[in-house]
């Protein structure tokens, strides 16, 4: 009955046209369905991954978490009811709208709408990105991750770890408190940041080429006010990314090169080097916290903090072996 991955997300917006442009011409997703009040965006072979609808408020609407099959969905529903969680079985009309076979709906302790489903519809039609990109890294890893905020972490984190069985990956305490959780080999599918406010911090979408990130950053630099966090590289999931403000006001992380973790042998631990190896100047932090983050990054650089790149077949070429001194020092190299 374990959750497998983040399968889809729903988003509320006051301006659907802005989301259509942002999702396609900036993020590179494919617009597959649009009406007066809703639109759907595709990232891969799934018929839809991001569902946006018009609303008086901006923000997330729902998070769709995937299970393997009908038996897993029924087992989870029974487990939730036994744990005192009020659930509703999704109607046939809702399942059709979400493009899935079946789903259940419930809320976490701070009011986030969660949908758990199985049997997402797929298509054999080639993915046609809204701008020229290599594609998104999805598959068994899911569509990316969501980082939520909470007024009191102790009010919500146990729900995800003890009832929904999210597994802790790691956590950091400076320059802000953040806790990361995995379902599969993606370093985290969910995280929480302690902000004193319930809501969302960001969603992350991962592309298959570093150049896709750099070219999106060039687009963002033409409107500097949309950049919430500058280009940089995370210490824990090792993603190279930047963050932009979506039309719904929350941040979207656009990244490349996330690490794959060995879930069977993983030990949760504190990350003492801060959230980033370099870059990622966070405009959303208070001035004192922003300066603290910069000081931490300088310390990481001085201590030789670094990590290997995470590549996959088709997006790299191995450089010719022309550095004997590099090979000779391989055992002593610090790679994170």
Residue ranges and their predicted role:
Residues 1-78, 82-103, 329:
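An N-terminus-focused feature that recognizes amino-terminal "leader" regions
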Residues 1-48, 148-188, 193, 335:
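Core segments of cupin and vicinal oxygen chelate
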Residues 5-14, 55-151, 179-180, 224-336, ...:
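Vicinal oxygen chelate
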Residues 19-24, 80, 111, 156, ...:
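Conserved active-site tyrosine of GNAT-family acetyltransferases
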Residues 41-46, 54-55, 106-109, 181-185, ...:
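Active-site beta-strand termini and strand-to-loop segments that position acidic
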Residues 47-51, 111-114, 187-191, 249-251:
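Short, charged/polar, Gly/Pro-enriched secondary-structure boundary elements
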Residues 172-238:
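A compositional/structural signature marking long, glycine- and acidic/polar-rich segments
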């Amino acid at each position: 009955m374990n959750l497998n991955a983040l399968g889809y997300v729903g988003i509320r917006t006051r301006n659907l046209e802005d989301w259509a442009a942002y999702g396609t011409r900036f993020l590179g997703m494919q617009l597959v369905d649009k009406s007066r009040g809703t639109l759907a965006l595709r990232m891969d072979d799934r018929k839809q991954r991001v569902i946006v609808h018009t609303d008086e408020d901006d923000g997330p609407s729902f998070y769709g978490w995937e299970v393997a099959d009908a038996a897993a969905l029924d087992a989870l529903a029974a487990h939730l009811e036994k744990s005192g969680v009020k659930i509703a079985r999704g109607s046939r009309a809702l399942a059709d709208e979400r493009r899935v076979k079946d789903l259940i709906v419930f809320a976490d302790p701070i009011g986030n709408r969660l949908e758990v489903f199985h049997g997402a519809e797929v298509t054999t039609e080639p993915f046609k990105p809204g701008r020229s990109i290599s594609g998104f890294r999805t598959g068994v890893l899911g569509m990316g991750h969501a980082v939520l905020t909470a007024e009191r972490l102790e009010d919500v984190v146990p729900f995800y770890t003890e009832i929904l069985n999210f597994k802790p990956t790691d956590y950091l305490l400076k320059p802000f408190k953040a806790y990361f959780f995995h379902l599969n080999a993606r370093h985290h599918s969910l995280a929480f940041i302690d902000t004193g406010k319930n809501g969302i911090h960001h969603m992350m979408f991962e592309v298959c080429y570093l150049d896709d990130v750099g070219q999106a950053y060039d687009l963002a630099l033409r409107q500097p006010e949309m950049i919430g966090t500058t280009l940089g590289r995370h210490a824990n999931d090792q993603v190279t990314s930047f963050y932009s403000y979506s039309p719904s006001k929350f941040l979207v992380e656009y990244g490349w090169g996330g690490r794959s973790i060995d879930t069977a042998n993983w030990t949760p631990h504190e990350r003492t080097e801060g959230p980033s190896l370099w870059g990622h100047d966070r405009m959303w932090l208070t001035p004192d916290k922003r300066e603290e983050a910069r000081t931490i990054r300088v310390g990481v650089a001085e201590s030789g903090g670094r990590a290997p790149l995470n590549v996959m077949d088709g997006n790299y070429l191995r450089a010719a072996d022309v550095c004997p001194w590099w090979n000779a020092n391989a055992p002593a190299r610090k790679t994170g």
